C-alpha cells in the first residue's frame, strides 16, 4: 500500500505518473474513488486543508475532518496510536499536518493498513506543495532541465523548499537560495544549490523566484533585526519587481514582509495558479496512492 511522506521517496517515473494524472484532471477528466479519508490537521491551514478536502470530494471520497485540539492527542495519545485508531475505524486515507517532524517513518508506514499523505510535518516535508510548485513551473515553462529556480526567504525552516528542491534536482533544474545567513541551513549543500548573498544578483540569475514566508511560529530566537529591514533586503519590492521575470509563493503571504502588498497578484505572479493547481495535483496524489 502506497503512502506519500516525502518527495525524496518518489522516483522520476512516479513523479511523471502523478503529473500525468494532474494534467488529465486539470483538463476535466472525471474519476471516482470509493474510499474514505481522515483529514487530521493539528496546525492551522487554509489552502492545503481545503484543497485536499475539495480534491477528495470531487473524486467521491468521503472526508472526515479532525483537528488536533479535538483529538485524543491533547490527552497524551501518541500520533502512532491515533493512526492505529483511524486504521481500526476502516479509513483508506489519512491526510495529516503535524507540528513535529515525522521521522523515522518507514517502519511505521509499513505497519499500517493506511494510505498516509503528509500535508506538512514540522520543518521536514510538504510533498504535495512540492509537486504543486513543480507542476506549475513545468506547465508554464514546458521544460525544467537547466531552468534556474531561486528560493528566497526562510530556507532553514521551510518544508516547501525541502520538498520542492529534490523534485527540481531530479529533472535537471538549477537551484539557488537566498536569505539571511541565520536562515540558511548549514547542510544546504546537500540540496545541490547555489547560495546567493545578494538577492538582486539572484533575481538577475533566476528564471523564476519562489518567495517563502518567515516561519515565525518555528523561530525560537531572533533571526532578523526587524521585518522592515528583512523586506528591504530580501523582499519583493517595487524596484525588484522591474527585474524579476516570474515569481511564486506557496502561501500564506506576509504582505510587505515577503512581497509588497500591491504585487501579490500581477502579470508576473504565478501565486494564484499555484492555488488552482492544488486541486488537480492532490486529486492525482489520491489516485496515485489508490492504484
UniProtKB/Swiss-Prot annotation:
HAMAP family: Asp_carb_tr
Enzyme class: transferase
Pfam families to which the protein is assigned, alphabetical: OTCace (PF00185), OTCace_N (PF02729)
Family listed: Belongs to the aspartate/ornithine carbamoyltransferase superfamily. ATCase family.
Name by which UniProt lists this protein: Aspartate carbamoyltransferase catalytic subunit
InterPro entries hit by this protein: Asp/Orn_carbamoyltranf_P-bd, Asp/Orn_carbamoylTrfase, Asp/Orn_carbamoylTrfase_sf, Asp_carbamoyltransf, Asp_carbamoyltransf_Asp/Orn-bd
Alphabetical list of PROSITE patterns matching this protein: CARBAMOYLTRANSFERASE (PS00097)
Residues that hold carbamoyl phosphate according to the record: 47-48, 97, 126, 129, 251-252
GO molecular function: amino acid binding; aspartate carbamoyltransferase activity
Function (record text): Catalyzes the condensation of carbamoyl phosphate and aspartate to form carbamoyl aspartate and inorganic phosphate, the committed step in the de novo pyrimidine nucleotide biosynthesis pathway.
Keywords annotated in UniProt: Pyrimidine biosynthesis, Transferase
Subunit record text: Heterododecamer (2C3:3R2) of six catalytic PyrB chains organized as two trimers (C3), and six regulatory PyrI chains organized as three dimers (R2).
Biological processes annotated in GO: 'de novo' pyrimidine nucleobase biosynthetic process; 'de novo' UMP biosynthetic process; amino acid metabolic process
Binding site for L-aspartate: 75, 159, 213
Catalytic activity: carbamoyl phosphate + L-aspartate = N-carbamoyl-L-aspartate + phosphate + H(+)
Pathway: Pyrimidine metabolism; UMP biosynthesis via de novo pathway; (S)-dihydroorotate from bicarbonate: step 2/3
EC number, UniProt record: 2.1.3.2
Amino acid at each position: 500500500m502506497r503512502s506519500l511522506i516525502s518527495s525524496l521517496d518518489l522516483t522520476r517515473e512516479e513523479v511523471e505518473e502523478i503529473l500525468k494524472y494532474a494534467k488529465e484532471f486539470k483538463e476535466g477528466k472525471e474519476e471516482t474513488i470509493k474510499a474514505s479519508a481522515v483529514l487530521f490537521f493539528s496546525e492551522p491551514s487554509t489552502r492545503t486543508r481545503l484543497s485536499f478536502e475539495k480534491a477528495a470530494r470531487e473524486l467521491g471520497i468521503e472526508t472526515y475532518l479532525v483537528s488536533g485540539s479535538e483529538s485524543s492527542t491533547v490527552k497524551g495519545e501518541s500520533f502512532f496510536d491515533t493512526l492505529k485508531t483511524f486504521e481500526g475505524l476502516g479509513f483508506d486515507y489519512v491526510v495529516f499536518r503535524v507540528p513535529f517532524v515525522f521521522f523515522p517513518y518507514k517502519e511505521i508506514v509499513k505497519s499500517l493498513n493506511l494510505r498516509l499523505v503528509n500535508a506538512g510535518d514540522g520543518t521536514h516535508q510538504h510533498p504535495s506543495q512540492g509537486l504543486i510548485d513543480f507542476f506549475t513551473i513545468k506547465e508554464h515553462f514546458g521544460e525544467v532541465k537547466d531552468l534556474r529556480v531561486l528560493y528566497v526567504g526562510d530556507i532553514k525552516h521551510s518544508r516547501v523548499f525541502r520538498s520542492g528542491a529534490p523534485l527540481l534536482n531530479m529533472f535537471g533544474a538549477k537551484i539557488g537560495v537566498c536569505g539571511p545567513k541565520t536562515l540558511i541551513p548549514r547542510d544546504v549543500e546537500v540540496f545541490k544549490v547555489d547560495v546567493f548573498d545578494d538577492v538582486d544578483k539572484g533575481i538577475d540569475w533566476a528564471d523564476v523566484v519562489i518567495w517563502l514566508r518567515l516561519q515565525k511560529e518555528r523561530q525560537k530566537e531572533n533571526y532578523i533585526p526587524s521585518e522592515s529591514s528583512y523586506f528591504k533586503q530580501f523582499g519583493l519590492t517595487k524596484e525588484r519587481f522591474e527585474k524579476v521575470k516570474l515569481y511564486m509563493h506557496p502561501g500564506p503571504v506576509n504582505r510587505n514582509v515577503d512581497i509588497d502588498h500591491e504585487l501579490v497578484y500581477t502579470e508576473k505572479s504565478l501565486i494564484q495558479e499555484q492555488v488552482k493547481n492544488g486541486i488537480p495535483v492532490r486529486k492525482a496524489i489520491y489516485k496515485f496512492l489508490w492504484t
